[in-house]
Regions:
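Sec-dependent N-terminal signal peptides
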Residues: 4-14
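Catalytic glycan-binding domains that act on GlcNAc-containing polysaccharides
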Residues: 20-153
Length: 153
């Protein structure tokens, strides 16, 4: 893992931030068997691709942190791995890796489908209201994902 971050730091000195983020999307997607455009679409919808974005507006008192808007509910588990809120705000590739791991957990639970994508934002809880929120979020991701795929062609 240290080798990966060393390469990212080296690349950041040689390339623009957009190209470094492209490396981050690809690296995380490869590690978790995801599409890089899906991760980028999530980051775009979640934070507007802002590395230091913080959202304090969650109804349950949690906050969302960084590029991938990692919910603070994950911090106790992440802290055991040496991942702090400050690192999520200052290391965009780390935010992408953590976001990809969270999405991969939902995919493992629900399959590679829009329920898993919607759970990234809304959580997996039951109920028709939460299901509607998951669906609405997944539709926003789908629109952005399609635009990214079209750009690639």
């Amino acid at each position: 893992m240290l080798k990966v971050w060393s390469v990212v730091l080296l690349l950041s000195g040689l390339m623009g931030s957009h190209q470094v983020l492209a490396y981050c999307w690809d690296e995380a997607a490869s590690r978790y068997d995801l599409e890089p455009e899906l991760l980028q679409a999530i980051a775009d919808v979640e934070s507007g691709l802002r590395v230091q974005a913080i959202n304090y507006a969650n109804r349950n008192g949690t906050r969302d942190i960084g590029l991938m808007q990692i919910n603070s509910i994950h911090l106790p588990r992440l802290l055991k791995q040496g991942i702090t809120e400050e690192r999520l705000l200052s290391e965009p590739c780390l935010s992408v890796q953590v976001g990809a791991s969270i999405l991969a957990e939902f995919i493992q639970r629900f399959g590679y489908n829009w329920m898993a994508v919607g759970s990234y934002n809304v959580g997996p809880g039951p109920g028709p209201q939460r299901e509607a929120l998951r669906q609405r979020y997944a539709e926003r991701i789908w629109v952005r994902y399609q635009a990214l795929i079209a750009q690639r062609r």
